[in-house]
From Swiss-Prot:
Tree of life domain: Bacteria
Source taxonomy: Bacteria, Bacillati, Bacillota, Bacillota incertae sedis, Caldicellulosiruptorales
This protein's name: DNA repair protein RecO
Keyword check for Metal-binding: no
A Gene Ontology term for the protein's cellular component: bacterial nucleoid
Chain's gene name: recO
Function comment: Involved in DNA repair and RecF pathway recombination.
HAMAP family, per database record: RecO
Pfam families: RecO_C, RecO_N
Record key words, sorted: DNA damage, DNA recombination, DNA repair
Record GO biological process: DNA recombination; double-strand break repair
Cross-referenced InterPro entries: ARFGAP/RecO, DNA_rep/recomb_RecO_N, NA-bd_OB-fold, RecO, RecO_C
NCBIfam families named among the record's database cross-references: reco (TIGR00613)
Length: 244
């Protein structure tokens, strides 16, 4: 079988047989794939370090009939320390759950991979997890084609909106004339902040700051909209609310 080299971050792990794991890995070349890490649970396995969630590695893999399997692997960067802090474990788990939910298997999306790596790095360096989460929510909507229309009214295309509303049904802004009963009013400051996040390069995400009140206002839009897009609840958020 031909050996293939790729880089990727481990999203999830499932124990397989007595000493192996099935890993869900987001790779740069093949998107989200499942990979067999054979005998990685043995005490002296050379694959054990690269067979845990939050590990960004270079993998040498081969494609068998039904699944990829790891031939060798080396760690590029470890985000494992995030799992050792309860709050950071939840926030990093939230980002990973979003990635896993938005991407189908073998759906290549290098932007999402870079977004995840940058966001985990920001968490690792101590940036406010709530700010990182809002940035991530907006960016992943952009990179997966579900971004909200925030530059004009989704119905009449008017751009000079002085009083803005948000339509979950239509996925964007509505003006005062076009708004419907269930549309919620949002401040222009919120609209501007979201557009700044959209326009900011991934390498400059660390420069974005959001006051707590502004962050919460953005959350009232992004969380329900993501739930509507995915048509399911994000499970880890329920646990987060429980421990708070």
């Amino acid at each position: 079988m031909k050996l293939i080299k790729t880089k990727g971050i481990v999203l999830k792990e499932t124990n397989f047989e007595e000493s192996s794991k099935i890993l869900t890995v987001l790779t740069s070349d093949f998107g989200k794939i499942q990979v067999l890490s054979k005998n990685c649970r043995r005490l002296l396995s050379v694959l054990s370090a690269c067979s845990q969630p939050l590990m960004f590695c270079e993998f040498v893999i081969r494609k068998t009939k039904d699944i990829y399997s790891i031939s060798s692997a080396s760690v590029i960067e470890s985000f494992f320390e995030l799992s050792q802090d309860v709050n950071l474990a939840i926030y990093s788990g939230y980002l990973i759950e979003l990635v896993d939910s938005f991407l189908e298997f073998e759906q290549k999306n290098e932007d999402v991979l870079r977004l995840l790596l940058n966001s985990l790095y920001l968490l690792k360096k101590g940036k406010d997890p709530e700010v990182v989460s809002r940035i991530f929510e907006i960016k992943i909507l952009v990179y997966t084609g579900f971004f909200l229309q925030f530059t004009q009214c989704v119905k009449c295309q008017r751009k000079d909106i002085t009083r803005a509303f948000f339509s979950f049904k239509d996925g964007g802004l509505t003006c005062e004339k076009c708004k419907e009963e269930n549309d919620i009013e949002i401040e222009i400051e919120v609209v501007k902040s979201i557009l700044v996040i959209v326009a900011t390069n991934l390498k400059k995400l660390n420069k974005i700051s959001l006051e707590r009140s502004l962050n919460n206002k953005i959350k009232t839009i992004t969380l329900p909209y993501i739930k509507m897009v995915l048509q399911k609840d994000i499970k880890i958020l329920d646990f987060f609310r429980f421990i708070q």
